[in-house]
Amino acid sequence: MHDAESTVDSLLKEIDNEMEQTKSNITQNGSEDTPHNWKLPLQEIGDDTMEMLVKHNTRSNATENSRGRSPSKMSTISNESLNLGLLRVNSELEESPAAVHQERIKNSVANGALGHANSPKVLNNLKNMAQDIDKLARDEEKPVKLSSSPLKFTLKSTQPLLSYPESPIHRSSIEIETNYDDEDEEEEDAYTCLTQSPQILHSPSRIPITNAVSINKLNLDFTLNPNESDKSLVSDTSVDSTGRELDTKTIPELPFCMSSTPEMTPVDEKCNLPSKLLNTSNNSHSDSRSPTASVEDLNISTNLPGADSSQNNPVTTDADALIENDVVRDLQQNMEHIDDAFDEKKVLDEGCSNEPVTFLGENDTRSIVYSNKGTNANVQEFSQEDSLAHSEPKFKDLNATSDDVWNEDKETDANISTSTKSEESYIADYKVTRQEDWDTKKLHQESEHANEQPAIIPQKDSSEETFTELNNESEFQRNFKDGEEYRIVQHEESLYGQRTKSPEENIINGSEIGVDHGEAAEVNEPLAKTSAEEHDLSSSCEDQSVSEARNKDRIEEKEVETKDENIETEKDESEYHKVEENEEPEHVPLLPPLPRWEEIQFNEPFIDENDTSNDSIDLTRSMKPSDYISIWHIQEEEIKSNSPESIANSQFSQQSSITTASTVDSKKDNGSTSFKFKPRIVSRSRIYNPKSRVSSLNYYDNEDYILSNSEWNALDPMRRNTLISKRIQDNIRTQKGHAPLIRPSIMKLNGEDSGFQNHFLEVEQPQEHENIPLSTHLSEQDITTNVGLDEQKLPTNTQDEAEISIREIESAGDITFNRGDLLSLSFDEELGQDFANFLDALDHDSTSFNHGPDDSSSFQRDSSKKSFNSLWESSYELKPPPSIRKQPIAPDVLQKLLESDTKDDADLEKIREERITEPRTGLGIGMLKTPVKDVSIALAASIKGYEASFSDTDSRPEGMNNSDAITLNMFDDFEEDKMTPSTPVRSISPIKRHVSSPFKVVKAGNKQENNEINIKAEEEIEPMTQQETDGLKQDIPPLLAQTKDNVEAKEETITQLEEPQDVEQEFPDMGTLYLSIKAISTLALYGTKSHRATYAIVFDNGENVVQTPWESLPYDGNIRINKEFELPIDFKGKAETSSASSERDSYKKCVITLKCKYEKPRHELVEIVDKVPVGKSFFGKTKYKFEKKYVQKKPKQDEWDYLFAQDGSFARCEIEINEEFLKNVAFNTSHMHYNMINKWSRIADKIHGSKRLYELPRKAPHKVASLDVEACFLERTSAFEQFPKQFSLVNKIVSKYKLQQNIYKEGYLLQDGGDLKGKIENRFFKLHGSQLSGYHEISRKAKIDINLLKVTKVLRNEDIQADNGGQRNFTDWVLFNECFQLVFDDGERITFNAECSNEEKSDWYNKLQEVVELNVFHQPWVKKYCEKLAEEEKTRTTGHNLKQDFN
């Protein structure tokens, strides 16, 4: 690589030396103003060498030496991707060297870096520039018009490869206004400028004329180390390690003029510095440096003096060295900040627009700036004073801050690099003024951002904006004295920007703020300290200050408003964060204010006890809920309606229909409530669950007794007292441990007015009879055993006793009162009627109770009226939950439950006493005595879903407990009854099924026609024992038996019956025989015309007789019939008797009879010869002539009377249908001829009338006609075959079948579905008849065979419906936009798409649609019929060929 670089360097040096020598020769001869005569063809260099040459020149050449030239001005033009320094010499515009130098400092570029200069776009632009140069070189032969003051431009790096004419007639892409004599040429120039692109407008050449770097460093990083930064600041040469640069030469410059375009508006900017700032003389411009930035290096300043400047300008002071050292040291300390800023602005470079570019003119008095609002205004000429007064404020408002900072940075670096010790005072004063200007601009920008009304800022080139912001960021990082002020402003700006601006805008604003302070900080530089006393500013700077002060008042007002908004926003945000920090650790919600309660009123506490306004629900609603969720919601609403906390004005309670009124009233009273706490006796517990739910009975043995928080004890005072509640729990555990066998009892009420005389609850005999006061804490047994059977009632004057009694009885464990079963359990006067209504509803719903075992034996029933309706024979069974699964039950209790007879009271009492003394554990079942007569318990193997499993022996062995004999088997989750299809012993073998798929995957090399799977029938379930079937026929849910059927449906298979192997499948018949009677010929019957005969054909198959209509008998004796008859052929032994020896030779006999009708002629025409006299002579004989004539005479006898039978039968033909006949005509149309026989004719009597007709002898059977018949037999091969009614339809069906089989097409199709699960594959398909075969698209191996006979329909793309009616995904929309889909009869779908033209897709769809439509003609008999026809055709063709060969 180094060898290649060195070779290129040597080549470039040789080229430069040759151009230098040629240039010197031309200069000596005094022919600088004439066009050059030397050229260097670009074609010989090559593209790669040209690119390297351009890069080398644009980085290595940073100086230009013009000898013998007048002072010239430099105009800095910022192009799209490059900065071209063009020198234009104008002898007419003579200005002071100080003003020229001041303007150069203003327009210079400091530490600029173009990050995108080595991008492919820039290299492409460079190639275009080279092509333009070549084009301009070819135009040098044209006549030129020399001006009095020729304009020239100087290339800073190398001699031009091609010469350029100096005539103003020669035009380039960028033109500046000049004095032309020809107005037409001016118009042409303006038009040319308007038609050029923005990239060409600003440069006559596309070769970058900027500082360049050595070829050895073509690819540099975006960041530099401090050493390289020092070198770039100290030296103006390239960053090449050799420190050597190519000599720069000058060539004539083309005149150019910038005219306004719709994208450009002229803006003038000029700032004149004192003449002392310049080191150059009026006669030489050799000391000037190029103010443009280099292309490759991003962080190298190219306008600082270097080795060459020190040689050319030997007069340098110590102050210059000090200033340079300070700057270098300051930059070394902050270089890492520059790197960070660069990385930060990288994102901004990508998002910037490339359209707007700012052009700062140095020789010209105007600047061109792109604006967002383009106008077609002409170029406006301003004087230097007007441009300062008008254009400078407009430019400051329109352009971004980064542009100004860029210019200021260039100015600052120029001051550092070119000023002397005597000039430092001017620079310091100038910077003081610039600091004030930048403060004003900063406030103006902040106000604009705060009000979200940005000024019209022209967009800049991304490269320009990027390295400008980087330089400004570095300037800010070098500022330490003003850091505190920057942090305050940045904090205010970031707080507001986070809420109002996007992250990208915050980055931009942040960079601008940093630039402002960085620029303001220039006052504190050492350069400013050394010259603080000199305050002599140029006139242009004063004018600029005046113009910028015009907007000062407006900016200050906006600044005040912005600061106020920022302060308020900061306060709000700080308060918000404080509140957030305080709220995070506590998490305490704000509670609503408590309502003001009224005092408790005890007026009339026991009178209005039946008031249900605050109760849960109406009594009739308790049976309505059918599921647990509904019950739970009802309970929740009713608890809230009864609770004072929820009825009050609480925002946490749910507003139900009951609590709405009270809540509204409470809101009106400002927190007070109308709720009156009326203490009343709760005589009824509201129970809401209508369904029976059996809870665990032994839950308090394993865990602590937990009192339920149900709705009916929500207001229980004892429940609210924790100490009392714990005491009750301990007492319950103690009593259960001491007397676990004592059963709770309920008394019977025999009051006459109670309405409960006929309802008895069997209870135990209590041991004690005493009233327990409310203040005593009662245990469970104290409560449940203190009431006897001696007509003693519970006290009804306390609330707690009744409520505790019901609750503790329910939680006793041995007797379970489900809340859904007991609608009301009050012990007052209204209990009887409520409980009677409940029993009626209970009987209607076929629900029952779980009762204690001590009451089971006391079941009494009215023997006078018995009406049995077994509960377990209903359509459903109740299932207990798995909590009491397999719970043992005493055998004697179960025996009493199953007994149908009753026992007297003495036996019941005896049994009860025995049970009390006998220790046992288990489930108690209480019996409810009721007068309802239509409910009884009969003997059965299952009761309420409980199955009784009896032991094999009646007597159980010793040591076996009572609970071991009989257990409760429950069908809760059907775990014990997994009904798998199997073949049990002594069961019928299941019917085999044939499962066929609409498509089947074909293995490579083994393509099968059928893919059958034999499975067991799901209908055959393993039979159960007799004990199980007695009580569980209705217990098995239908969904269980249908589970596997549903699984099969999801597997997308079609099930068809298959013929068993051991049993012959029975068909309804053997098939259908079609007989077509074509004609009867050679009929031996004369005198048809005179008898006016008619005929009919009678068809008799032994079962049915069919007769054709009567028609006229033709005179010629040939009858054309053309009648078809359908004849089902039964099996041979179907009509046989029990004797197996007698077999018929034929299946059926078909008789065809010809019947005739005729009219007897009334008269008979007889020919007679009549003798007619002709004349008579007088003396002669009479003459006669003989005439023949026909006369009618009454016939003596008719010959037809002896030809017909009495029913008119004349001829008969019997067709014997046997195996041979069927074999000959099977699936084939055969033509046959049969003789029709007359066996009814008689011999006529010679003496007419001597004998009667039936006494005459018969003639022997003889042939009277010939019968032509076509027969075809369609044999049945499947019980599901359907045959047409007419033979003419057979031919049509066969023709349609042939048409289907002849359909053929092949091509590539995209397949989705079928054997491809979750993927799409392109395959080669062949459609042949009803078979669609898929092959691998490359290897053509068989992959899938699709049976189109199972396709029900073919859908187009618009008819295809996605699953669940949803929209199709994007992949399907792209790949299957114009597709078609096959829908099978089992729901399977396969989608196809053809990657071809629309005509080809339509052809695929039409042919598949035609095949599916012709599926109705596809039956087994059709296929066999066509095969037989094909065989006959082949035989006929073979015979014909043999005959031709023989001949």
From Swiss-Prot:
Keywords: Cell cycle, Cell division, Phosphoprotein. GO terms for cellular component: cellular bud neck; cellular bud neck contractile ring; cellular bud scar. The modification Phosphoserine is found at S10, S78, S81, S91, S96, S167, S367, S511, S616, S805, S811. It comes from the Eukaryota. Phosphorylated by CDC28. Residues 1302-1413 form the PH domain. Required for establishment of the axial budding pattern in haploid cells. Cooperates with other bud site selection proteins to recognize a spatial landmark during mitosis and they subsequently become a landmark for downstream polarity establishment factors that coordinate axial budding and cytokinesis. Involved in the septin organization at the bud neck. This is Bud site selection protein 4. It comes from Saccharomyces cerevisiae (strain ATCC 204508 / S288c) (Baker's yeast). The gene is BUD4.
